[in-house]
Amino acid sequence: MQQMVPASGYDRAITIFSPEGRLYQVEYAREAVRRGTTAVGIKCKDGVVLAVDRRITSKLIDVSSIEKIFQIDDHIVAATSGLVADARVLIDRARLEAQMNRISYGEAITVEALAKKICDIKQAYTQHGGARPFGLALLITGIDRHSARLFETDPSGALIEYKATAIGSGRPIAMEVLESKYSEDMTVNEGMELALYALSKTTEELKPENIDMAIVKDSGKLVEKISVDEIEKIVKAVYKKVEAEEAEAEKNKGEEDIE
């Protein structure tokens, strides 16, 4: 885990820059994201995929009450990592912005326009005293009149578009997997398998009931939540692939030892 440098008093107000040009409260908010659940987003040739490991910590928790993926509009879905209460506020605001766009302009909001509106709100909370930044990162994705889009927003209000990305505590490991295995030609079905494969590398055991997953396909342009039964099938396929890779690695190691 990255160690935070002593702030020498410059972290007492959100509006004060340190001599190095840093806003420590924003960096602390990013730390909340780094401790959050891992979410993976993948843009495919026929749609987009979001998957989140909800990381259920107690068997007494009702799994159905823990949401990490939220439908914003018919064609837009978002995944969150960070403070749950902050997520609720921004998701509600995103839904409101989508509704207002339909009422004002008679059409659905684009994925990019919605992502920018949320980032504007996040950025404003880095400038005003008496408030704190949102300790939350969002993956906002969907299909609009342009094409499939996938955006990541961070607590500073920065907005970056990706082909595939991850947020949360498992981001470094998941990004290594995505960078090595992602292809722009992959289908949504292949994207779902890759997303769960990346999540499997960030946890000791990937449990289907702990996974939240959604897709949006080019054909229908509608958000579709993936059932636990379907996720279980994909998880089994993922672990078969992992076992095959481990067996191949063990075989190669044995051949090297012989040489």
Curated annotation (Swiss-Prot):
Q: Which GO terms describe its biological process?
A: proteasomal protein catabolic process; ubiquitin-dependent protein catabolic process
CDD domains in the record, alphabetically? proteasome_alpha_archeal
Q: How is its activity regulated?
A: The formation of the proteasomal ATPase PAN-20S proteasome complex, via the docking of the C-termini of PAN into the intersubunit pockets in the alpha-rings, triggers opening of the gate for substrate entry. Interconversion between the open-gate and close-gate conformations leads to a dynamic regulation of the 20S proteasome proteolysis activity.
Task: Mention any one GO cellular component term assigned to this protein in its UniProt record.
Answer: cytoplasm
Q: Which UniProt keywords apply?
A: Cytoplasm, Proteasome
User: What does this chain do?
Assistant: Component of the proteasome core, a large protease complex with broad specificity involved in protein degradation.
Q: How the protein assembles, per its UniProt entry?
A: The 20S proteasome core is composed of 14 alpha and 14 beta subunits that assemble into four stacked heptameric rings, resulting in a barrel-shaped structure. The two inner rings, each composed of seven catalytic beta subunits, are sandwiched by two outer rings, each composed of seven alpha subunits. The catalytic chamber with the active sites is on the inside of the barrel. Has a gated structure, the ends of the cylinder being occluded by the N-termini of the alpha-subunits. Is capped at one or both ends by the proteasome regulatory ATPase, PAN.
Which protein are we looking at? Proteasome subunit alpha
